[in-house]
Amino acid sequence: MIKFTKARKILMGLMVLGQLTAVPAIANAAPTAKETAEIKKYDSLDTAAKDYAKALQEISNYGSREMLKSINPDVDKYVAKINDPTLKKQWEDSNTMLIEQFEVSVYKVNENGNDGEVVFLIKGYDEKALDKYLGDNASQYAKVDSGKDEVEVDIEKYIKLQYNYLKNTKKINLATSTVKFAKGNDNKWQLVK
């Protein structure tokens, strides 16, 4: 089990990476005695690295989901009103892909005697590229009435365009994170306190 204060630091780092500034209440909660006392131990550094990558992914997804329920609540209302199951699914999937976008994997495991270091690779969508794509293709979903200074947006076309982009675009390398481990007297690996 990850020490909760360490998990909070990781969550904060991942949120900063995702340009998210608010902190969910759970991240500010004081750890209980049980949470601070239990640090999971592993027989191998590779196993620890894989387990920790899963934990990092869950923490980032949970934190993002708690902070952002939707990427656009106004579109949520529109989609709920029109009652189109396909469009609703595409919108929900787009929300999930953007809110829970981070993939954490083990990049490198360095074992040196009783000291260990794991480098994690964090991937996600290039949101600037998505914004550029949506901007470059605005004519597919938006009409400008320059006489009235108004823009009419076809939300259904916008959702489909965004969904198809996310579904067909590979995630990019956003960051790496290094975590130190140590082998204790019991010959088991654990996070460095």
For each feature predicted by the language model, list its residue ranges:
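Sec-dependent N-terminal signal peptides of Gram-positive bacterial secreted proteins and lipoproteins
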Residues: 2-30
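Surface-exposed, charged secondary-structure patches
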Residues: 87-158
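Hydrophobic beta-strand residues in large extracellular and virion-surface proteins
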Residues: 52, 104-106, 118-120, 179-181, ...
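Short beta-strand edge/turn micro-motifs at domain boundaries
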Residues: 139-153, 164-193
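Primarily extracytoplasmic ectodomains and periplasmic/lumenal surface modules that are beta-strand-rich
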Residues: 60-63, 125, 187-189
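Generic marker of residues within folded, mature protein domains
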Residues: 19, 108-110, 169-171
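Core segments of small alpha/beta cavity-forming domains
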Residues: 30-105
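Short glycine-rich, low-complexity/disordered patches
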Residues: 68-74, 153-160, 172-177
